Amino acid sequence: MKLIRTEDAVGQVLCHDITQIIPGVVKDAVFRKGHIVTKEDIPVLLSVGKEHLYVWEKKEGILHEDEAAVILRDLCINDNMTASEPKEGKIEIRAEADGLLKINSEKLRAVNGLGEMMIATIHGNFPVKAGDRLAATRIIPLVIEEEKRNRAKEAAGGEPLLKILPMSHKKVGIVTTGSEVFKGRIQDAFGPAIRAKLAAYDTEVMGQVILDDCQEDISAAILKFVRQGADMVLCTGGMSVDPDDRTPGAIKAAGADIVSYGAPVLPGAMFLLAYLGEIPVLGLPGCVMYAGRTVFDLVLPRVLAGERLTKADLDSYGEGGLCLNCEVCHFPNCGFGKQ
């Protein structure tokens, strides 16, 4: 690549796109990389402010911005994704299928830390739809040393930085406890709220049982749903420290391994996560009945995508785990649950 006066560029090959920007009207290339400059092009180039041009001068070990952008694309792209053609050194990656987006954050930071190149993504651990933008790559200068390309590959490791976990059909059992609901003193509000959340995904509610605050009965109901083929069991009610609340003990008595009782999320601090073998058993706090967004909205898509969550996964929600209860909710396009 060499720099020359625009008036001297006739017959030369452009090594980058020439962009015209008219605010509110257009932002696009008037000439593409690889275009051979003609005499008639000179006034056009000058009209967009190009007094000098970079023209192609191929050197060993040097990559053009579009070549390097393709390399960054290949570090990111995975199954169920598609990428745009390079344009001005930029490439966009989009989802081709619905699922849960996973990002290797540590390796992403390592690649970006090399300088002169960038990969920007949306937040991971959230569901995406086919067609959604996932990431974009760009090289900062017009050319980059091939050696830096090799360092980027090494920093990224052997696996793509992005992954979409599919969400297959899941059968869900709901166990609701509380003497006030069981004895008909109040109407159950958990069931409708949970069904509305589940309806956003490929799920089937096998049934809902309403029980008194009896640990043995709650445990038996959990185990019955599991025997019937439930992929997940949701337990509602009885999650506080009140002496009549027996749900956490019932989940443990059913044989489930408690991952965490409590999460650094508001609303949702009294959330319980357990696994009965491979079956997730979730204890949902009362806020799920009335709050627009809670810890349940953060955990549900990850569980449905087959992730086996750990206490560390829940602990990481502390930063970003406070819902601001905005007058108009824009979740997930907000800070809630962003790690």
Briefly describe each language-model feature range.
Residues 1-88:
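Short, low-complexity N-terminal leaders and the immediately following helix N-cap/first helix
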